[in-house]
Regions:
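Extracellular/periplasmic helix-loop-helix junction of adjacent transmembrane segments
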Residues: 37, 41-73
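Extracytoplasmic gate region of multi-pass secondary transporters
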Residues: 41, 220-276
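Helix-breaking motifs and short loop linkers at transmembrane-helix boundaries and internal kinks
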Residues: 52, 86, 107-113, 141, ...
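Conserved MFS/SLC helix-loop-helix module at the cytosolic interface between two early adjacent transmembrane helices
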Residues: 73-111
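Helix-to-loop junctions at the C-terminal end of transmembrane segments
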Residues: 75-86, 274-286, 372
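Cytoplasmic helix-loop-helix junction between adjacent transmembrane helices
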Residues: 117-154
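Helix-loop-helix hairpin linking two adjacent transmembrane segments in secondary transporters
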Residues: 145, 151-196
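A membrane-interface helix-boundary motif in multi-pass transporters
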Residues: 172-184, 372-387
C-alpha cells in the first residue's frame, strides 16, 4: 500500500510540474550530458601520462571521436523511439544509460576499454539530447521555440565549463578517474529528480497518431528534411572543428596568448552568453533567417582570427563572438526543425538532423588534422569558413514544407454533441 501511495504521489507531482519546470529539468539533463561529453578534454593531459597505457596524440583523437559515433546512433534511434513510446521513458532510459557508462569510464583499464565505454555512453547522450529537445518544445509557448532550445543547448557548454573547472581542481592531485565519477554522480542525481518529476509530453499523449520515418522524406517534406541535416552537419563540423583545433591554430599563427584554457573558456562563455541574444532575435524574426545570419557572422569571425589580430582584447572579443555565432546557429537549426514537424514526427526529425549532424562532429578533428598537416593553419581556417557559409546558405534557403497534420480529436466536452 505504501509503495502504491508513493507511485501515486510521484504521478501527481509530475502532473503539477509547470511548463517552466519541465523545460528547466530538460535543461538540467543537458547540463549533465555536457559535463560527461566534454570532460574528456579536461582528462586528456592526465590520460596521455597514464602509466602503461601508451596513449599517443593520434589514439587520443580516435578515442575522442568515439563518443560522437555513439551520439550519431543514439540520436537516430532515440528520436524514433520517442515518437513511438512517448518522451518520458526513452529520456529516462537514455540518461540512465550514459550515467552508467560514464561511471564505467572511471574504471577503464586500457585505451581500448575507455574508447568502448565512451562510445556506449555516447549512444545515451545522443538519444537524451534529441528527446529532451522534443519534450521541451511541447511545453513551449508558440513563438518561443528558439529561446527554449537555446536554454537547453546552453547546457552543453555550461557542463563543459564545469568539467574544465573540476579538472583544474582535481587533475593534478587525484588524476582523471574522479572526473568520471563526479559526472556519473551528478547525472544520477538528475535522473532521480527526473524519475519523480518529469511528465509525459501533453501533445504526444493527446495525439498518439501513428507515424512512419518515411514521412520525413515524403513530398513535400523530403527536401526540407535533407537540407536540415546538411546544415546541421556543416555547422557541427565547424563548431567541433574549432573546439578541437583553435588553440593549435592560434599557436601556429603566433598569437599573443599562452593559455589554452583561456581560448576554450572564451569560446564557450561566448557561446552561452551570446546565444541568448540571438535567440531573442529569432523570436522576433524567425529561427531560419537568424540562423543564416549567425552562420555568416561565424564565418566572418573565423576570417578575423586568421588575419593576425594583435590586440589582446580585440582577439578575445572576436573569439567570444565566434562562439556565440557558431553555437547559436546550431541552436536555431534545432529550433527550426522542432517548429517544422508535427508532434508525432518531431522526435524522429530532431534525431535525424542531430544524428547526421554528429557525423560532422566525428569528421571535424580528422579533417582539421589532415588539412593542417597537408597545407597550414590558414587553410584550416578557410575550411571552417566554407562549412559555416554552407550552413548559412542551406538553412537560409527556401524549401517546401508540408502542413502539419491536424491533431487527433480529443475527448468531447461534457454535454458535447
Amino acid at each position: 500500500m505504501r509503495s502504491e501511495a508513493v507511485i501515486a504521489g510521484s504521478g501527481a507531482a509530475r502532473d503539477r510540474l509547470p511548463a517552466t519546470g519541465v523545460i528547466g529539468l530538460c535543461a538540467l539533463i543537458v547540463v549533465a550530458e555536457g559535463y560527461d561529453l566534454i570532460m574528456y578534454g579536461a582528462m586528456l593531459p592526465a590520460l596521455l601520462d597514464e602509466t602503461g597505457w601508451g596513449m599517443t596524440k593520434s589514439t587520443a583523437g580516435t578515442v575522442g571521436s568515439m563518443v560522437y559515433v555513439g551520439m550519431t546512433a543514439g540520436a537516430l534511434t532515440g528520436g524514433r523511439l520517442a515518437d513511438r513510446f512517448g518522451r518520458r521513458r526513452p529520456l529516462l532510459v537514455a540518461v540512465g544509460w550514459f550515467t552508467g557508462w560514464t561511471a564505467a569510464c572511471g574504471l577503464a583499464g586500457s585505451v581500448a576499454q575507455l574508447g568502448a565505454f565512451r562510445l556506449l555512453a555516447g549512444i545515451g547522450m545522443g538519444a537524451a539530447a534529441a528527446v529532451a529537445l522534443a519534450l521541451a518544445k511541447e511545453y513551449t509557448a508558440p513563438g518561443r521555440t528558439s529561446l527554449t532550445v537555446t536554454v537547453l543547448m546552453a547546457g552543453i557548454p555550461i557542463g563543459g565549463i564545469t568539467s574544465a573547472l573540476a579538472g583544474l581542481v582535481l587533475l593534478s592531485e587525484h588524476g582523471w578517474r574522479p572526473l568520471c565519477w563526479i559526472g556519473a554522480i551528478g547525472s544520477a542525481l538528475v535522473l532521480l529528480i527526473a524519475i519523480v518529476l518529469l511528465p509525459e509530453s501533453r501533445e504526444f499523449a493527446r495525439t498518439r497518431t501513428p507515424s512512419r520515418v518515411r514521412e520525413l522524406f515524403a513530398a513535400p517534406r523530403g527536401p526540407m528534411t535533407i537540407l536540415f541535416a546538411v546544415a546541421a552537419f556543416a555547422e557541427l563540423l565547424t563548431w567541433y572543428g574549432l573546439n578541437t583545433w583553435i588553440t593549435t591554430l592560434m599557436r601556429e599563427l603566433r598569437y599573443p596568448m599562452t593559455s589554452a584554457l583561456q581560448f576554450s573558456l572564451t569560446l564557450n562563455s561566448g557561446a552561452v552568453i551570446g546565444s541568448f541574444a540571438l535567440a531573442a532575435a529569432a523570436v522576433r524574426w524567425g529561427a531560419r533567417p537568424v540562423a543564416s545570419v549567425s552562420a555568416c557572422v561565424a564565418a566572418a569571425m573565423i576570417a578575423a582570427c586568421a588575419t593576425g589580430l594583435s590586440d589582446r582584447l580585440l582577439l578575445l572579443a572576436v573569439i567570444a563572438a565566434l562562439g556565440a555565432a557558431a553555437h547559436s546557429t546550431l541552436n536555431l537549426i534545432n529550433a527550426a526543425v522542432a517548429d517544422a514537424y508535427p508532434a508525432d514526427l518531431r522526435g524522429s526529425a530532431l534525431g535525424w538532423s542531430n544524428g547526421v549532424g554528429r557525423l560532422g562532429a566525428v569528421a571535424a578533428p580528422t579533417l582539421g588534422g589532415w588539412v593542417l598537416a597537408a597545407t597550414g593553419p590558414l587553410q584550416v581556417f578557410q575550411t571552417f569558413i566554407l562549412t559555416s557559409v554552407c550552413a548559412a546558405r542551406v538553412v537560409g534557403g527556401r524549401t517546401p514544407t508540408g502542413p502539419p497534420r491536424p491533431p487527433a480529436p480529443g475527448p468531447r466536452p461534457p454535454g458535447g454533441r
